[in-house]
Regions:
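Residue-level signal for inorganic ion chemistry
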Residues: 39, 86, 115, 129, ...
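Small-molecule kinase domains that catalyze NTP-dependent phosphoryl transfer to phosphate-bearing small molecules
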Residues: 74, 119-126, 133, 137-138, ...
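P-loop (Walker A) phosphate-binding loop of NTP-binding proteins
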Residues: 15
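Hydrophobic anchor at the beta1->P-loop junction of P-loop NTPases
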Residues: 10-12
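ATP-dependent NMP and nucleoside kinases share a basic, alpha-helical "lid"
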Residues: 90-102, 106-166
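Conserved lysine of the Walker
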Residues: 20
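N-terminal phosphate/diphosphate-binding loop that engages ATP/GTP or pyrophosphate donors
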Residues: 30-95
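Hydrophobic positions on the alpha1 helix immediately C-terminal to the Walker A/P-loop
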Residues: 23
């Protein structure tokens, strides 16, 4: 055991649709630590840009938008909800128009810079689990625990399709699969904080594992690094 009775960061990175958010939420709920969905933060920025007809090439307008934007995550009777400038946008940030643009928005340097700064501030003085694309490599390179999740594109598209169906969001499987492949290419080849495994991260291919099995494997690694029960 390396760290006792102290604040720590559990960084969960990986490809879109690998179960990062669900895993992070479950860990946070089970062990009473703070959960931060960094992907939803970028989705909020994307939605705000769309609502204000701002293109990703309009850097000055994006910067001005970021100066006034307010992103909050609240827990409403056990359900995580996201507020954009005081309005509940939990469902809107999962719409197709956001899905199609969020990867590009997250590659805009000024957006990445502002969101990383915000994530670091929100994590100060806390025991926290964060998931995203570059938590262990860029946001918190010294995180006590680093996990990297992968899965086949087909399995990830299937999971996203079923999640959307539960939320009443109707997007065809083929369209989701195309978006997953597109995002993989964008995320891994980005000039700004590309998706990659940290050298000291534990990598797990979740394709053939249930969520419960993934959680069990990951938690065994977490407990090697921190006393999460403290």
């Amino acid at each position: 055991m390396e760290n006792l009775c102290k604040n720590y960061v559990i960084a969960i990175d990986g490809e879109a649709g690998t179960g990062k958010s669900t895993l992070a939420k479950n860990i946070a709920k089970k062990y009473g630590i703070v959960y931060m969905d960094t992907g939803a933060m970028y989705r909020c920025v994307t939605l705000d840009m769309l609502n204000n007809d701002i293109d990703i090439s309009q850097i000055d307008k994006i910067s001005a938008l970021l100066d006034s934007i307010k992103i909050e995550m609240i827990n409403d009777n056990g359900e995580d909800k996201f507020l954009l400038n005081g309005i509940d946008v939990t469902k809107e940030i999962r719409e197709k128009r956001v899905n199609d643009l969020v990867s590009q928005v997250s590659h805009v340097p000024v957006v990445r810079e502002r969101m990383v700064d915000l994530q670091r501030k929100l994590a100060q003085g806390k025991k926290i689990v964060m998931e995203g694309r570059d938590i262990g490599t860029n946001v918190f390179p010294n995180a006590e625990v680093k996990i990297y999740l992968t899965a086949s594109p087909e399995e990830r598209a299937k999971r996203r399709f079923l999640q959307n169906k539960e939320k009443g969001i109707d997007i065809p499987y083929e369209e989701i699969l195309a978006n997953v492949i597109f995002r993989d290419n964008n995320d891994k080849n980005s000039d700004v904080a590309p998706l990659k495994k940290a050298k000291d991260a534990f990598e797990l291919d979740t394709t053939n594992y249930t969520l419960e099995e993934v959680e069990e494997i990951v938690m065994s690694k977490v407990k090697e690094k921190v006393d999460i029960n403290v």
